Amino acid sequence: MVRHDPFTNSVSEDSSFTPSVNPSTPYPQSGHYRPYYPPQLTYCQGQQGYQYDHTGDVGYGGRSRRHGSWASVNNEDNEELTPLTTGPASSSTFLTTDPYLSGGPDLPLSSSSASISSAGADFLRRQTVPRRGATIKKIKLTNGNFIADYPVPGPVSSSVEAKWLNDKTSNEFWHMRYTAATCDPDDFTPENGWKLKTTSYNRETELLVAITSYNEDKILYARTLHNVMLNIRDICNTKASKFWRRSAEEGRPGWQKIVVALVADGLDPMDKQVLDVLQTIGVFQDGILKKEVDGKKTAAHIFEYTTQLSIDATPQLVQPHPGDPNNLVPVQIIFVLKQENSKKINSHRWLFNALGRQLQPEICVLLDAGTKPGHKAIYHLWEAFYNNQNLGGACGEIHAMIKKGVKLLNPLVAAQNFEYKMSNILDKPLESSFGYVSVLPGAFSAYRYKAIQGRPLTQYFHGDATLAARLGKKGIYGMGIFTKNMFLAEDRILCFELVAKKGEKWVLQYVKPSKAETDVPEQAAELISQRRRWLNGSFAASVYSVFHFFRLYRSGHGPIRMLFLHIQAIYNIFSLIFSWFALANLWLTFSIIIELLPESANINLFGTADITHWINLVFAWVYLAFLMLQLVLALGNRPKAEKGLYILTLWVYAFLSFYLIVCSIILSVVAFKGALRDGGSIGAKLGNLFNSTNGVLVAAIMSTIGIYLIASFLYRDPWHMFSSFPQYMLLAPSFTNVLNIYAFCNLHDVSWGTKGSDRAESLPAISSSKQKDGETAVVEEQQRSQGELDESFKQVVRRAVAPYKPEDADEKPNLDDQNRTFRTRLVVVWLLTNAALAISIQTLNGLDTTKPLVEACLPNSYNPENGTVIVSTNGTCITQALEHDGDKLQDKQQIYFQAILWTTFALSMVRFIGCVFYWAMRQMGRCWRRN
């Protein structure tokens, strides 16, 4: 079998085809079902070019094709087969011109370079513009609720493969359902008249995959959604699982057991270009959003549709090709667009309480928009639950997106990459072995739905600001600042509550084969702001889990599991203590080691002892000065307004870290040489090495680096040790001194509250009227014709696949930032000048000369390295030596204090003279005062 490069345009002639631009049969009208598939095909005599979706997916394999048969290059677990996309060399059933070439004849240049702000304005216009001569349609309300089905554009419904169109009684592929939910998520129930279209198909839901978003751009959103659809395709096509294979054999395709929920946190912050992407695949439509229904404010706009289309991160349109076994399968999508920005916890309440209660899924997979699940990542998570009935939650490996190593040129990205890697190699496996993973990251994790019901979700949702009035003192209004910070890491609360659930024995697990990529902050200001929430939330949640450990005794865990949990609790307590004192320990390590080198090893890196002493002293002052600077910055400035000072701090601490590393290496070499010179056996030499002061340093360095290396090679993932470890070592002090200080100084910032939507105010409101029977409530709405819908859809596709040009996000300091900056500069100068004066007076003597003076009084035979010895000494000489340096310093300091006292006296005398002069003039004035 001949195998081809999967990224070439070479395909055998007999297997080439091109979807017709103008199908012989028109688009199906609403309510009718398309009698044909595929569209008329035009077979080319020459080679037809194809474009593969090769956007740098990590771990994705290739594919080869010859005479219509597909062969795996690798085995099924390691191979990712991506569907074909319509590229410049192929035609599209959607548009008569290539939508991917910006500035084409039917695509104005402005549309491909539209800014985000103009996209938002255009979005508002499309929601409110009236259509003249439109047909008026009456829509019945369901128990007073607005729930309506809308025809999808013809190209969307025409894209579905014929093999999925068996049910002629269903409009699943022809109509999209819109629900204007005017209730709280807890009240979104069939009893209250709210019923999802997906539940009407009477299908069991095995997997509910949720993607939560805030203001991510269309590239980030498409990256996540497209790779989720690839994962669903791989689940349905897998031959490794009897569960999914049996389901397909019984006539229940796997995709019918999977639902994708998209939850957007607010109409106002959402990138409107994302809505173009969703509209292209049929999950959204312009002009149907309702602000109010009979005076009841819409809380969420819910769209439901089953689509076989996708847009990848290029962005390019991905549509099925007849006979291609790598086509995407249909995906049931529920899009929940919240009217207001009410935070991620509220988005999860819509997911678990509104959608979950109706769908009753077995497993819920949580993803953040921008996270890119790898090949079979979702399948590996599901497999872990399927094979362990006591598994309540799981997470995969999240690693930094490094763009084939290009982003590692940024030291911040490299340092974070090392953090992610070592966490996945050391921390997560350890916690998984105990059965309690302290945090299942919300960006990529999964929960068994029945496991989180009850107290876990109840406690979790106490942090929802929209429930504050209902919960009273149990909500955020009754929480202290420490408890509020705990909910900044709400995923940690859910993890602990799940493991400690009364009468249950749920465990948490780390699933190594399940991998996902995520973007990491590339700027210092972004990293500082992100870690504030992480550090404060994780610290508060760690304290919470320690103080509530007794609740584990009410769970159903066995004695062996409880033993493991006790060991883990002790480990967590020690880790918490070390984290608390990290600031002091880092300073002590730095100050002791840089002084240890010239004192114990008698090595002066800067020539003489005097110069080395002063340079080390300056380094220590600089260290403390920038530490003090962090306190001033953190207490009064936003990181984005002080980018320059924060970047300077990172560079300074990186230099000091480099100096510390050099000193440590030299001390280690000296210790090894000393051990080799000592007599005795190898055991004695090792004992002398590790019992000495330098030996402890050697042991610490060897154990840390050695453990990192061995563990990385054990997991066959050592490359970060060479590409990211040096950057991490240089930035490690900044992670403690900068990030921790900023986090604790902003402990009060818990970012509660909701933000209203200005754009929602411009949406239309609807009011119902009674029918002639006086009971049925209906609303009147303009109905678009299929032709108008298809015509406007062309513009939607053009906007969706237009090259993305992000808006300039360089935020300029506002007036308040400028005022704070001036205050910060003034306070820093004030503190530094005072500190400089105090330190300079305390160190007027320079290098301590007491030791050589004392040694001069001792006999020449004295050798302190021989142990405790008794020698004859000159007591008077030693006394004078000890007093000499102190007297010398005292003499210099007395001069300074004399100057201070005389200056104080002079200033006081000036004030006194002024006082006397005023008194004299006042007394003398009485003589010539006129009455």
UniProtKB/Swiss-Prot annotation:
Record keyword Lipoprotein present: no
EC number from the UniProt entry: 2.4.1.16
Positions in coiled-coil regions: none
Residue ranges of the TM segments: 573-593, 615-635, 647-667, 695-715, 725-745, 826-846, 899-919
Residues spanning the signal sequence: none
Known glycosylation sites: N536, N691, N819, N866, N874
Cellular component, GO annotation: cell septum; plasma membrane
Highest taxon, organism lineage: Eukaryota
Disordered: annotated segments: 1-34, 56-92, 763-789
Keywords, alphabetical: Cell membrane, Cell wall biogenesis/degradation, Glycoprotein, Glycosyltransferase, Membrane, Transferase, Transmembrane, Transmembrane helix
Subcellular location: Cell membrane
The reaction(s) this protein catalyses: [(1->4)-N-acetyl-beta-D-glucosaminyl](n) + UDP-N-acetyl-alpha-D-glucosamine = [(1->4)-N-acetyl-beta-D-glucosaminyl](n+1) + UDP + H(+)
The keyword Transmembrane helix is annotated on this UniProt entry: yes
Compositionally biased region (Polar residues): 7-28, 83-92
One GO term of the biological process aspect: chitin biosynthetic process
Recorded topology in the membrane: Multi-pass membrane protein
Induction (UniProt): Induced by high temperature. Induced by the antifungal agent caspofungin.
GO molecular function, one term: chitin synthase activity
Designated name of the protein: Chitin synthase 7
Originating organism: Cryptococcus neoformans var. grubii serotype A (strain H99 / ATCC 208821 / CBS 10515 / FGSC 9487) (Filobasidiella neoformans var. grubii)
